[in-house]
Amino acid sequence: PSNRATLGGMVNTDACGKGSRIYGRTSDHVLELTCVLSNGEVLESVPLEPEALSEYKKKSGISANIFKIVDQVVSEKTNLIQEVFPKMSRFMTGYNLAKVYGNSENNFNLNYLLSGSEGTLAVVSKAKLRLTPLPKHKSLLVVKYETFDDALSDAEMLLKSDPAAIETIDEKILSLAKEDEIYLKIKDFVADEKGKSGRKKRPTRTINLVEFCGSNKNHLEKQVTALCKTIDATNNKSGKATGYYRTVDPQEISNLWSLRKKGVGLLGNTKGERKPLPFVEDTAVPPENLADYIREFRTLLESYGLEYAMFGHVDVGCLHVRPALDLKNPEEESWIRELSDKVVELVKKYDGVMWGEHGRGFRSEYTAEFFGEELHQDLRRIKEAFDPNNRLNPGKIVTPLSHDDKVV
Protein backbone atom coordinates (compact mmCIF):
# COMPACT_ATOMS: atom_id res chain seq x y z
CA PRO A 1 0.00 0.00 0.00
CA SER A 2 1.03 3.59 -0.64
CA ASN A 3 1.48 4.42 3.03
CA ARG A 4 4.16 1.71 3.32
CA ALA A 5 5.90 2.03 -0.06
CA THR A 6 9.56 3.07 -0.20
CA LEU A 7 11.64 3.95 -3.25
CA GLY A 8 14.17 1.25 -2.41
CA GLY A 9 11.47 -1.37 -2.31
CA MET A 10 9.93 -0.05 -5.52
CA VAL A 11 13.24 -0.31 -7.38
CA ASN A 12 13.95 -3.81 -6.08
CA THR A 13 10.55 -5.20 -7.12
CA ASP A 14 10.19 -2.91 -10.15
CA ALA A 15 6.89 -1.87 -8.63
CA CYS A 16 3.89 -0.44 -10.40
CA GLY A 17 0.21 0.04 -9.68
CA LYS A 18 -2.79 2.11 -10.73
CA GLY A 19 -2.00 4.04 -13.87
CA SER A 20 0.86 1.79 -14.99
CA ARG A 21 -0.59 1.60 -18.51
CA ILE A 22 0.34 5.30 -18.81
CA TYR A 23 3.29 5.64 -16.43
CA GLY A 24 4.92 2.21 -16.73
CA ARG A 25 6.96 0.50 -14.02
CA THR A 26 9.56 1.97 -11.67
CA SER A 27 12.37 0.91 -14.03
CA ASP A 28 10.93 3.17 -16.73
CA HIS A 29 11.84 6.14 -14.51
CA VAL A 30 15.26 5.04 -13.23
CA LEU A 31 18.08 7.17 -14.68
CA GLU A 32 21.04 5.99 -12.61
CA LEU A 33 21.70 3.44 -9.87
CA THR A 34 24.61 3.19 -7.46
CA CYS A 35 24.94 -0.34 -6.09
CA VAL A 36 27.18 -2.25 -3.72
CA LEU A 37 28.17 -5.70 -4.97
CA SER A 38 28.63 -8.81 -2.82
CA ASN A 39 32.40 -8.18 -2.46
CA GLY A 40 31.90 -4.55 -1.39
CA GLU A 41 32.72 -3.14 -4.82
CA VAL A 42 30.62 -0.15 -5.95
CA LEU A 43 28.93 -0.37 -9.34
CA GLU A 44 27.59 2.72 -11.12
CA SER A 45 24.80 1.89 -13.57
CA VAL A 46 23.84 4.37 -16.30
CA PRO A 47 22.69 3.90 -19.92
CA LEU A 48 25.80 3.24 -22.02
CA GLU A 49 26.52 3.82 -25.69
CA PRO A 50 28.74 1.16 -27.38
CA GLU A 51 32.00 3.07 -26.81
CA ALA A 52 31.25 3.64 -23.14
CA LEU A 53 30.24 0.00 -22.68
CA SER A 54 33.60 -1.08 -24.10
CA GLU A 55 35.37 1.11 -21.54
CA TYR A 56 33.28 -0.35 -18.68
CA LYS A 57 34.30 -3.86 -19.74
CA LYS A 58 37.96 -2.88 -19.26
CA LYS A 59 37.47 -1.96 -15.59
CA SER A 60 38.99 -4.04 -12.82
CA GLY A 61 37.06 -6.19 -10.36
CA ILE A 62 33.86 -8.12 -10.91
CA SER A 63 32.10 -5.09 -12.44
CA ALA A 64 33.91 -5.61 -15.75
CA ASN A 65 32.84 -9.25 -15.86
CA ILE A 66 29.25 -8.27 -15.11
CA PHE A 67 29.10 -5.99 -18.14
CA LYS A 68 30.75 -8.64 -20.33
CA ILE A 69 28.42 -11.47 -19.27
CA VAL A 70 25.19 -9.46 -19.45
CA ASP A 71 26.09 -7.99 -22.84
CA GLN A 72 27.02 -11.43 -24.15
CA VAL A 73 23.76 -13.02 -22.99
CA VAL A 74 21.41 -10.33 -24.31
CA SER A 75 23.32 -10.04 -27.60
CA GLU A 76 23.56 -13.76 -28.33
CA LYS A 77 20.03 -14.61 -27.17
CA THR A 78 18.13 -11.67 -28.69
CA ASN A 79 15.68 -13.80 -30.68
CA LEU A 80 15.01 -16.18 -27.80
CA ILE A 81 14.47 -13.29 -25.39
CA GLN A 82 11.97 -11.69 -27.77
CA GLU A 83 10.17 -15.01 -28.08
CA VAL A 84 10.00 -15.74 -24.35
CA PHE A 85 9.25 -12.33 -22.85
CA PRO A 86 5.53 -11.44 -23.11
CA LYS A 87 4.59 -8.31 -25.07
CA MET A 88 2.62 -6.43 -22.45
CA SER A 89 3.01 -3.43 -20.17
CA ARG A 90 3.30 -5.72 -17.15
CA PHE A 91 6.51 -7.15 -18.58
CA MET A 92 8.56 -9.89 -16.94
CA THR A 93 10.42 -8.67 -13.86
CA GLY A 94 13.38 -10.29 -12.14
CA TYR A 95 16.34 -9.98 -14.55
CA ASN A 96 14.56 -8.17 -17.35
CA LEU A 97 16.79 -9.18 -20.24
CA ALA A 98 14.40 -7.80 -22.85
CA LYS A 99 14.91 -4.20 -21.72
CA VAL A 100 18.71 -4.17 -21.39
CA TYR A 101 18.84 -3.09 -25.04
CA GLY A 102 15.13 -2.94 -25.81
CA ASN A 103 14.62 0.42 -24.10
CA SER A 104 13.72 3.88 -25.39
CA GLU A 105 17.40 4.87 -25.84
CA ASN A 106 18.39 1.54 -27.45
CA ASN A 107 21.58 1.68 -25.39
CA PHE A 108 22.93 -0.91 -22.97
CA ASN A 109 21.05 -0.21 -19.74
CA LEU A 110 21.77 -2.33 -16.69
CA ASN A 111 19.16 -0.42 -14.68
CA TYR A 112 16.41 -2.60 -16.16
CA LEU A 113 18.23 -5.73 -14.98
CA LEU A 114 18.88 -4.39 -11.49
CA SER A 115 15.34 -3.06 -11.06
CA GLY A 116 13.17 -5.97 -10.01
CA SER A 117 16.13 -8.15 -9.02
CA GLU A 118 14.87 -8.23 -5.40
CA GLY A 119 18.30 -7.68 -3.87
CA THR A 120 19.76 -10.82 -5.46
CA LEU A 121 22.35 -9.01 -7.61
CA ALA A 122 23.41 -5.97 -5.59
CA VAL A 123 22.38 -3.62 -2.80
CA VAL A 124 21.04 -0.36 -4.21
CA SER A 125 22.49 2.56 -2.25
CA LYS A 126 21.45 5.46 -4.47
CA ALA A 127 18.91 6.02 -7.23
CA LYS A 128 18.45 8.95 -9.59
CA LEU A 129 14.88 9.03 -10.88
CA ARG A 130 12.94 10.85 -13.57
CA LEU A 131 10.00 12.83 -12.16
CA THR A 132 6.71 13.21 -13.99
CA PRO A 133 4.45 16.20 -13.24
CA LEU A 134 1.11 15.34 -11.67
CA PRO A 135 -1.88 15.88 -13.98
CA LYS A 136 -3.81 19.09 -13.38
CA HIS A 137 -7.26 17.63 -13.95
CA LYS A 138 -8.98 14.35 -13.12
CA SER A 139 -12.34 12.85 -13.94
CA LEU A 140 -13.67 9.54 -12.64
CA LEU A 141 -16.38 7.33 -14.07
CA VAL A 142 -17.93 4.61 -11.88
CA VAL A 143 -19.28 2.08 -14.39
CA LYS A 144 -21.75 -0.37 -12.83
CA TYR A 145 -22.40 -4.02 -13.72
CA GLU A 146 -24.57 -6.89 -12.64
CA THR A 147 -21.80 -9.49 -12.91
CA PHE A 148 -18.03 -9.61 -12.65
CA ASP A 149 -17.83 -11.25 -16.09
CA ASP A 150 -19.68 -8.26 -17.56
CA ALA A 151 -17.16 -5.87 -16.01
CA LEU A 152 -14.18 -7.80 -17.37
CA SER A 153 -15.69 -8.24 -20.82
CA ASP A 154 -16.32 -4.50 -21.03
CA ALA A 155 -12.67 -3.62 -20.34
CA GLU A 156 -11.63 -3.77 -23.99
CA MET A 157 -14.29 -1.23 -24.92
CA LEU A 158 -13.34 1.03 -22.00
CA LEU A 159 -9.68 0.92 -23.02
CA LYS A 160 -10.51 2.46 -26.40
CA SER A 161 -11.29 5.72 -24.59
CA ASP A 162 -7.61 5.87 -23.47
CA PRO A 163 -8.10 6.34 -19.70
CA ALA A 164 -5.23 6.63 -17.24
CA ALA A 165 -6.53 3.64 -15.29
CA ILE A 166 -9.31 1.08 -15.08
CA GLU A 167 -9.73 -0.73 -11.78
CA THR A 168 -12.26 -3.49 -11.15
CA ILE A 169 -13.87 -4.25 -7.79
CA ASP A 170 -15.87 -7.46 -7.44
CA GLU A 171 -19.00 -8.37 -5.52
CA LYS A 172 -17.06 -9.73 -2.52
CA ILE A 173 -15.27 -6.42 -1.90
CA LEU A 174 -18.42 -4.34 -2.42
CA SER A 175 -20.33 -6.58 -0.02
CA LEU A 176 -17.66 -6.29 2.69
CA ALA A 177 -17.50 -2.52 2.14
CA LYS A 178 -21.10 -2.24 3.36
CA GLU A 179 -19.83 -3.10 6.85
CA ASP A 180 -17.12 -0.43 6.73
CA GLU A 181 -17.28 3.32 7.32
CA ILE A 182 -16.19 3.95 3.74
CA TYR A 183 -19.58 2.78 2.47
CA LEU A 184 -21.33 5.84 3.89
CA LYS A 185 -19.13 8.00 1.66
CA ILE A 186 -19.58 6.03 -1.57
CA LYS A 187 -22.96 4.27 -1.33
CA ASP A 188 -24.76 6.79 -3.57
CA PHE A 189 -22.15 6.32 -6.30
CA VAL A 190 -22.51 2.51 -6.43
CA ALA A 191 -26.27 2.33 -5.86
CA ASP A 192 -28.52 0.33 -8.19
CA GLU A 193 -29.59 2.29 -11.25
CA LYS A 194 -33.24 3.28 -11.61
CA GLY A 195 -35.31 3.76 -14.74
CA LYS A 196 -37.53 6.75 -15.53
CA SER A 197 -40.37 5.12 -13.62
CA GLY A 198 -38.21 4.91 -10.51
CA ARG A 199 -38.03 1.13 -10.67
CA LYS A 200 -34.62 -0.46 -10.14
CA LYS A 201 -32.79 -1.84 -13.14
CA ARG A 202 -30.46 -4.83 -12.83
CA PRO A 203 -28.55 -4.70 -9.52
CA THR A 204 -25.04 -3.27 -9.20
CA ARG A 205 -22.80 -6.06 -7.95
CA THR A 206 -19.42 -5.02 -9.35
CA ILE A 207 -17.86 -1.84 -10.72
CA ASN A 208 -15.10 -0.52 -12.94
CA LEU A 209 -13.44 2.70 -11.80
CA VAL A 210 -12.32 4.50 -14.96
CA GLU A 211 -10.04 7.50 -14.36
CA PHE A 212 -9.01 10.16 -16.87
CA CYS A 213 -6.14 12.56 -16.21
CA GLY A 214 -4.58 15.40 -18.15
CA SER A 215 -3.53 19.03 -18.38
CA ASN A 216 -6.26 20.05 -20.86
CA LYS A 217 -9.61 20.15 -19.09
CA ASN A 218 -11.68 20.47 -22.27
CA HIS A 219 -9.98 17.51 -23.93
CA LEU A 220 -10.51 15.48 -20.77
CA GLU A 221 -14.23 16.23 -20.66
CA LYS A 222 -14.60 15.29 -24.33
CA GLN A 223 -12.95 11.95 -23.61
CA VAL A 224 -15.32 11.21 -20.76
CA THR A 225 -18.41 12.41 -22.64
CA ALA A 226 -17.55 10.20 -25.61
CA LEU A 227 -17.24 7.16 -23.33
CA CYS A 228 -20.53 7.98 -21.59
CA LYS A 229 -22.28 8.07 -24.98
CA THR A 230 -20.84 4.67 -25.84
CA ILE A 231 -22.11 3.24 -22.55
CA ASP A 232 -25.52 4.89 -23.04
CA ALA A 233 -25.87 3.20 -26.43
CA THR A 234 -26.01 -0.24 -24.76
CA ASN A 235 -27.24 0.88 -21.35
CA ASN A 236 -28.81 -1.94 -19.33
CA LYS A 237 -28.58 -4.50 -22.12
CA SER A 238 -27.68 -8.01 -21.00
CA GLY A 239 -23.92 -8.34 -20.48
CA LYS A 240 -23.40 -4.58 -20.55
CA ALA A 241 -23.17 -1.83 -17.93
CA THR A 242 -26.30 -1.01 -15.96
CA GLY A 243 -25.26 2.65 -15.70
CA TYR A 244 -22.53 4.94 -14.43
CA TYR A 245 -21.73 7.80 -12.10
CA ARG A 246 -19.52 10.64 -13.33
CA THR A 247 -17.57 13.00 -11.07
CA VAL A 248 -14.78 15.58 -11.11
CA ASP A 249 -15.16 16.36 -7.41
CA PRO A 250 -11.76 15.73 -5.70
CA GLN A 251 -13.35 14.47 -2.48
CA GLU A 252 -15.66 12.04 -4.26
CA ILE A 253 -12.76 10.76 -6.35
CA SER A 254 -10.66 10.34 -3.21
CA ASN A 255 -13.45 8.42 -1.44
CA LEU A 256 -13.93 6.05 -4.37
CA TRP A 257 -10.21 5.32 -4.59
CA SER A 258 -10.22 4.74 -0.83
CA LEU A 259 -12.66 1.90 -1.45
CA ARG A 260 -10.17 0.36 -3.87
CA LYS A 261 -7.25 0.87 -1.46
CA LYS A 262 -9.21 -0.77 1.34
CA GLY A 263 -9.68 -3.97 -0.66
CA VAL A 264 -7.06 -6.04 1.19
CA GLY A 265 -8.09 -4.67 4.59
CA LEU A 266 -11.74 -5.46 3.94
CA LEU A 267 -10.85 -9.04 3.03
CA GLY A 268 -9.21 -9.38 6.44
CA ASN A 269 -12.71 -9.00 7.92
CA THR A 270 -13.94 -12.19 6.23
CA LYS A 271 -15.81 -14.33 8.77
CA GLY A 272 -15.03 -18.00 9.36
CA GLU A 273 -11.92 -20.18 9.44
CA ARG A 274 -11.10 -19.66 5.79
CA LYS A 275 -9.22 -16.44 5.11
CA PRO A 276 -8.28 -14.92 1.72
CA LEU A 277 -4.59 -15.61 0.97
CA PRO A 278 -2.24 -13.87 -1.51
CA PHE A 279 -0.32 -16.79 -3.07
CA VAL A 280 -1.62 -16.31 -6.65
CA GLU A 281 -2.34 -12.64 -6.22
CA ASP A 282 -0.61 -10.80 -9.05
CA THR A 283 -0.81 -12.91 -12.18
CA ALA A 284 -1.01 -10.85 -15.37
CA VAL A 285 -2.09 -11.65 -18.92
CA PRO A 286 -2.58 -9.49 -22.03
CA PRO A 287 -5.75 -7.43 -21.38
CA GLU A 288 -7.50 -8.94 -24.41
CA ASN A 289 -7.11 -12.40 -22.78
CA LEU A 290 -8.19 -11.34 -19.30
CA ALA A 291 -11.91 -12.19 -19.41
CA ASP A 292 -11.32 -15.73 -20.72
CA TYR A 293 -8.40 -16.26 -18.35
CA ILE A 294 -10.34 -15.16 -15.28
CA ARG A 295 -13.33 -17.28 -16.33
CA GLU A 296 -11.11 -20.38 -16.24
CA PHE A 297 -9.40 -19.19 -13.05
CA ARG A 298 -12.77 -18.89 -11.31
CA THR A 299 -13.83 -22.33 -12.54
CA LEU A 300 -10.61 -23.75 -11.07
CA LEU A 301 -11.20 -22.16 -7.65
CA GLU A 302 -14.84 -23.19 -7.61
CA SER A 303 -13.86 -26.80 -8.38
CA TYR A 304 -12.20 -26.77 -4.94
CA GLY A 305 -15.31 -25.25 -3.38
CA LEU A 306 -13.44 -22.04 -2.58
CA GLU A 307 -14.69 -18.52 -2.23
CA TYR A 308 -12.42 -15.74 -3.46
CA ALA A 309 -12.14 -12.02 -4.09
CA MET A 310 -10.89 -10.33 -7.25
CA PHE A 311 -9.95 -6.71 -7.78
CA GLY A 312 -7.30 -4.65 -9.50
CA HIS A 313 -5.84 -3.38 -12.73
CA VAL A 314 -8.08 -4.63 -15.51
CA ASP A 315 -6.51 -2.15 -17.97
CA VAL A 316 -3.18 -4.02 -17.86
CA GLY A 317 -4.56 -7.52 -17.32
CA CYS A 318 -3.47 -7.83 -13.68
CA LEU A 319 -6.15 -8.79 -11.16
CA HIS A 320 -5.47 -9.48 -7.50
CA VAL A 321 -6.98 -12.86 -6.65
CA ARG A 322 -7.21 -14.13 -3.09
CA PRO A 323 -8.71 -17.60 -2.55
CA ALA A 324 -9.98 -18.22 1.00
CA LEU A 325 -8.33 -21.22 2.70
CA ASP A 326 -8.17 -22.61 6.24
CA LEU A 327 -4.46 -23.16 6.89
CA LYS A 328 -5.25 -25.11 10.06
CA ASN A 329 -6.68 -27.79 7.78
CA PRO A 330 -3.74 -29.86 6.37
CA GLU A 331 -5.67 -30.74 3.22
CA GLU A 332 -6.43 -27.11 2.44
CA GLU A 333 -2.85 -26.14 3.21
CA SER A 334 -1.73 -28.62 0.52
CA TRP A 335 -4.04 -26.88 -1.96
CA ILE A 336 -1.67 -23.90 -2.03
CA ARG A 337 0.84 -26.02 -3.95
CA GLU A 338 -1.82 -27.70 -6.11
CA LEU A 339 -3.48 -24.43 -7.05
CA SER A 340 -0.18 -22.65 -7.67
CA ASP A 341 0.91 -25.36 -10.11
CA LYS A 342 -2.42 -25.23 -11.94
CA VAL A 343 -2.44 -21.44 -12.10
CA VAL A 344 1.07 -21.48 -13.60
CA GLU A 345 -0.22 -23.66 -16.45
CA LEU A 346 -3.28 -21.45 -16.87
CA VAL A 347 -1.21 -18.26 -16.99
CA LYS A 348 1.10 -19.78 -19.61
CA LYS A 349 -1.92 -20.82 -21.69
CA TYR A 350 -2.96 -17.16 -21.89
CA ASP A 351 0.57 -15.81 -22.57
CA GLY A 352 0.93 -14.17 -19.17
CA VAL A 353 3.25 -14.09 -16.17
CA MET A 354 2.86 -15.43 -12.64
CA TRP A 355 4.29 -12.29 -11.02
CA GLY A 356 2.88 -9.13 -12.61
CA GLU A 357 3.41 -6.76 -9.72
CA HIS A 358 4.78 -8.05 -6.42
CA GLY A 359 8.04 -9.72 -7.38
CA ARG A 360 8.90 -13.40 -7.43
CA GLY A 361 10.09 -14.15 -3.90
CA PHE A 362 8.93 -17.58 -2.75
CA ARG A 363 7.61 -18.36 -6.22
CA SER A 364 11.15 -18.44 -7.64
CA GLU A 365 10.95 -22.18 -8.37
CA TYR A 366 8.63 -21.34 -11.27
CA THR A 367 11.30 -19.23 -12.99
CA ALA A 368 12.30 -21.96 -15.45
CA GLU A 369 8.62 -22.52 -16.33
CA PHE A 370 8.39 -19.03 -17.77
CA PHE A 371 11.93 -18.34 -19.01
CA GLY A 372 12.59 -21.82 -20.39
CA GLU A 373 15.61 -23.92 -19.44
CA GLU A 374 18.06 -22.18 -21.80
CA LEU A 375 17.38 -18.65 -20.55
CA HIS A 376 17.09 -19.97 -17.00
CA GLN A 377 20.72 -21.10 -17.21
CA ASP A 378 21.67 -17.67 -18.59
CA LEU A 379 19.98 -16.02 -15.61
CA ARG A 380 22.13 -18.22 -13.39
CA ARG A 381 25.24 -17.08 -15.32
CA ILE A 382 24.27 -13.48 -14.63
CA LYS A 383 23.67 -14.23 -10.94
CA GLU A 384 27.12 -15.87 -10.84
CA ALA A 385 28.74 -12.76 -12.34
CA PHE A 386 27.16 -10.48 -9.74
CA ASP A 387 27.15 -12.74 -6.69
CA PRO A 388 29.45 -15.77 -7.14
CA ASN A 389 29.15 -16.83 -3.49
CA ASN A 390 25.33 -16.61 -3.36
CA ARG A 391 25.32 -14.11 -0.50
CA LEU A 392 22.61 -11.72 -1.67
CA ASN A 393 19.04 -12.82 -0.86
CA PRO A 394 19.98 -16.45 -1.53
CA GLY A 395 17.30 -18.74 -2.90
CA LYS A 396 15.32 -16.00 -4.62
CA ILE A 397 14.89 -15.80 -8.41
CA VAL A 398 17.88 -18.06 -9.29
CA THR A 399 21.08 -19.43 -7.76
CA PRO A 400 24.59 -18.99 -9.25
CA LEU A 401 25.52 -21.44 -11.99
CA SER A 402 28.29 -23.03 -9.91
CA HIS A 403 26.01 -23.65 -6.90
CA ASP A 404 23.72 -26.59 -6.19
CA ASP A 405 21.62 -24.54 -3.77
CA LYS A 406 17.89 -24.65 -4.42
CA VAL A 407 15.58 -21.72 -5.02
CA VAL A 408 12.63 -21.30 -2.68
Model regions and ranges:
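FAD-binding subdomain of flavoenzyme oxidoreductases
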Residues: 1-155, 160-162, 389-399, 403-408
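Active-site cores enriched in adjacent His and Asp/Glu residues with nearby glycine-rich loops
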Residues: 1-5, 286, 354-355
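Short low-complexity, flexible loop/linker segments enriched in glycine and/or proline
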Residues: 10-13, 181-183, 324-327, 369-372, ...
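Short, conserved loop/turn and helix-capping segments at secondary-structure boundaries
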Residues: 23-24, 145, 333-337, 372-376
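Intein/HINT protein-splicing elements and their conserved insertion hotspots or analogous self-processing inserts
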Residues: 50-95, 182-196, 206-209, 213-234, ...
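C-terminal substrate-recognition/cap domain of FAD-linked oxidoreductases
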Residues: 101-105, 111-338, 344-346, 350-353, ...
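Ferredoxin-type iron-sulfur electron-transfer modules and their immediate structural context
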Residues: 274, 349, 353, 361-408
